[in-house]
From Swiss-Prot:
GO terms for cellular component: plasma membrane. The lineage of its organism: Archaea, Methanobacteriati, Methanobacteriota, Methanomada group, Methanococci. Keywords: Cell membrane, Membrane, Transmembrane, Transmembrane helix. It comes from the Archaea. Its main location: membrane. It is found in: Cell membrane. The chain crosses the membrane at residues 68-88, 94-114. Pfam families: DUF2111. It is a multi-pass membrane protein. This is Uncharacterized protein MJ0405. InterPro entries: UCP006557.
Length: 131
């Protein structure tokens, strides 16, 4: 049996759920939110779906800009918590966005900058080690 998951600018929460759940598990059940460009999406916390009509201001910003956004929202369920949101693209067309609460608060970037281990160079993009 072949099953295909597709995402479009008009995907609804139920269509986004399998991908959002997979990412939620990959990040050890950190809060994850995902939406399409034109419709509200889904929000997961502690292994559970907590919202299937989630707008997400920072998700909308990432969709509008078409680039990764690192921000600390001032309103909403994640107010005061740093988040990282990435657009979901098909070429230059932004279909939606997915984000996670950044419990490291940027510590990972600091650790990479401090360590600058040469053996990591072959696994990471050049911009991971700014000059």
């Amino acid at each position: 049996m072949k099953i295909m998951i597709t995402i479009s600018e008009n995907s609804e929460a139920k269509e986004l759920m399998p991908i959002a759940q997979a990412v939620h598990i990959l990040v050890n059940k950190l809060p994850v939110a995902m939406r399409s460009k034109n419709k509200p999406g889904v929000r997961l916390e502690k292994g559970e779906v907590v919202d299937t009509n989630y707008e997400g201001y920072v998700l909308k910003v990432a969709i509008e800009k078409g680039e990764v956004v690192r921000a600390t929202p001032i309103i909403g369920p994640y107010a005061g918590l740093p988040v990282i949101v990435a657009p979901i693209k098909d070429g230059d067309n932004v279909l939606g966005a997915i984000g996670v609460v950044d419990i490291t608060a940027g510590i990972f970037e600091d650790i990479v900058a401090i360590s600058r281990r040469p053996e990591l160079y072959k696994f990471l993009p050049e911009d991971a080690f700014p000059k």
